[in-house]
Amino acid sequence: MSSSFLSSTAFFLLLCLGFCHVSSSSSDQGTYIVHMAKSQMPSSFDLHSNWYDSSLRSISDSAELLYTYENAIHGFSTRLTQEEADSLMTQPGVISVLPEHRYELHTTRTPLFLGLDEHTADLFPEAGSYSDVVVGVLDTGVWPESKSYSDEGFGPIPSSWKGGCEAGTNFTASLCNRKLIGARFFARGYESTMGPIDESKESRSPRDDDGHGTHTSSTAAGSVVEGASLLGYASGTARGMAPRARVAVYKVCWLGGCFSSDILAAIDKAIADNVNVLSMSLGGGMSDYYRDGVAIGAFAAMERGILVSCSAGNAGPSSSSLSNVAPWITTVGAGTLDRDFPALAILGNGKNFTGVSLFKGEALPDKLLPFIYAGNASNATNGNLCMTGTLIPEKVKGKIVMCDRGINARVQKGDVVKAAGGVGMILANTAANGEELVADAHLLPATTVGEKAGDIIRHYVTTDPNPTASISILGTVVGVKPSPVVAAFSSRGPNSITPNILKPDLIAPGVNILAAWTGAAGPTGLASDSRRVEFNIISGTSMSCPHVSGLAALLKSVHPEWSPAAIRSALMTTAYKTYKDGKPLLDIATGKPSTPFDHGAGHVSPTTATNPGLIYDLTTEDYLGFLCALNYTSPQIRSVSRRNYTCDPSKSYSVADLNYPSFAVNVDGVGAYKYTRTVTSVGGAGTYSVKVTSETTGVKISVEPAVLNFKEANEKKSYTVTFTVDSSKPSGSNSFGSIEWSDGKHVVGSPVAISWT
């Protein structure tokens, strides 16, 4: 996932690929998360932690509690053998014993692109000075010295805040302020599996030695910083989406990954600390919700009124590649900005190709230089990829080298070329990345070109008897069209866990994003990169997620009474799916119009989300009904919800009737498929009429009633959508459409995805 934007650090290379069970260094033990039925604690215990410890002692003399959980789940984590875990499962009050899982990270112009600028206070008057809304970020920590955490102009820390600032290696509590009001770190689960943290390589504290966490938290809620840029690129004023909101960081990711026991502990603390929004740019694979630590923790946060925003993943453009698909999570894909960093690949045959680059340094001589394909400068089978140790110095010295994208980090390829004596690099996309161009702060003159240009350049360099080339770096341009387009790396639907829930929910800027950076690493994150920068430009759904987190904080400041579902609804139903000329958003991976499986409800539009007209709200009871519709057992529901809940055998539960702002219809034969929704007026009195669009004539979409008349604010109205299928299509076929309600002032849109199973 993160390999789609790996330009920064070796950290990403060490992360587990996918949602994987963590293997211990010991063949006997692993970390387990134990869910307990809190209400079943025997009266002989005065504290739940004592009960947990006693239960553990009954099956092991040596096992110790790593964490006890009170908010995210009821239970604890510990190290056990498989036999001990099986034995613990038989103890009274134990609901489940789940193995630790490891997650991966999904990793100035943006506010203007989204319509947020110095006039933001006109749209969000309650957030114009400073806000008491707190954005919690689970990531790699924070670089507190960054200007993005300046508390100038901020009032006192909110009285509702219950969090703290933890000291540790290279970090003191005094580094927090009225902006950065909380900082914690969680490493017990990580260290129990990976061993003690090597403090010569990373700080055992909230300090961010990687950069990812500083980038995401400042994207969500960084203070206004004038004169921001990366090496002169993207210069301007940097600001987070909610620059007057408070920030609390929870460091859960380390060099070896992000572990579910630590993530749950961080969510547990964040709930107790009273954050309002949780931003998590991490994930991995797909798993049933009762086995997914992020989904379980997010459910508890949702119950406390905390919106949870998560990255969709960087495994696109493959279908069904999403992470974080629980319906109580806002799942965010990535799109581009209207800003680019062009750099020309100039060939000796007179042809030029535009790529992208963030290189800053001594330019190449103003002449054509010898040019070689990496595959012809190596004896290794993967020499074309410019991996460490594969290039023959005698063949590349003094030359520009063409490398193919894949396997190792883009910037690492340039480092390999430079180490072998090459003077420049042309990096070519392959079919996996198509025409998507992600800019990097290379260590030598370099440009990245798309697949089509790469094919032409490769043919030239491998067939011309004396190929030559040069590279010209052109700086920053804005106003690029079309924009946005869906990023190729952005993970796609359909949702393989619950196909009747359309995911991702929406997209936000996630390509070439400028935000604050750590002072402990260069912009590439490579050990050979001695440069230090205050801001960096990187890409991934890791970057799009905090955009939505920050926008949710803005909406929370304006509408403090709104639930997480209401805030998500406002963001989704006001998202746009077309450009200003009416043409549909494009998918860079195909060059064709994107679909709801690519962009969800569309691209976020904060200027309209403040007044959506109608919202689709959801309660905890609705989500419990959803779990019943999945045929979850009572213990499985309890693992997710921390409560003893029994589905009503006399009630018919349907995933299709979850009050979600989108429609995913799975067709299994001809017939009628009915979906019910309830909308709440937040725009006052008004009469809304429905408009239905559909790509296919094989499915008739009808809405009853077709008109909703609201007499006052907060009034609720229900409607039923019937999808009548009168023709079959091959399994795997998809068709798309939309359902829109409008009163002439508001347009409340919902995407429709129809899939034949």
From Swiss-Prot:
Cited CDD domains: PA_subtilisin_like, Peptidases_S8_3
Induction entry: By methyl jasmonate.
Residues with glycosylation annotation: 170, 352, 376, 379, 631, 644
Biased composition (Basic and acidic residues): 198-213
EC number: 3.4.21.-
Phenotype upon gene inactivation: No visible phenotype under normal growth conditions, but mutant seeds are defective in mucilage extrusion.
GO cellular component, one term: apoplast
Biophysicochemical property: temperature dependence: Optimum temperature is 80 degrees Celsius. Thermostable.
Active site, UniProt feature: 139, 212, 542
The protein, known as: Subtilisin-like protease SBT1.7
Organism per entry: Arabidopsis thaliana
Gene coding for it: SBT1.7
